[in-house]
């Protein structure tokens, strides 16, 4: 699973006392997620602590639970060592957006479980 969400140590978010459900219309946050059904995008943070715990209770073994930042930095480091030309072709700004803690690096989590 790869999504934005909270881990077991930061759920529920103290800065989100009303929960994590949000509505966006034209890329702007809306005040009421129930207004204008079908005309706005609804989203919510995943509870990775609960997902991890539920998987383990069902017999899955957690192989990896980390931030997108750590996951992608590790994956790209291995790829760049084996194929240095890839680093020249990569758009560094795109990689930074995916891995920077203030952008998508920390809010997105990676959970890998197996039987």
Predicted features along the sequence, with ranges:
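Long, Lys/Arg- and hydrophobic-enriched amphipathic alpha-helices
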Residues: 1-115
């Amino acid at each position: 699973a790869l999504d934005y969400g909270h881990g077991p140590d930061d759920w529920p978010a103290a800065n989100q006392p009303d929960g994590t459900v949000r509505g966006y219309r034209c890329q702007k946050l809306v005040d009421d997620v129930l207004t204008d059904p079908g005309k706005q995008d609804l989203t919510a943070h995943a509870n990775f602590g609960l997902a991890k715990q539920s998987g383990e209770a069902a017999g899955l073994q957690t192989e990896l639970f980390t931030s997108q930042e750590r996951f992608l930095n590790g994956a790209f480091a291995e790829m760049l060592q084996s194929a240095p030309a890839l680093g020249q072709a990569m758009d560094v700004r795109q990689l930074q957006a995916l891995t920077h803690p203030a952008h998508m690096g920390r809010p997105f989590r990676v959970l890998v479980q197996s039987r």
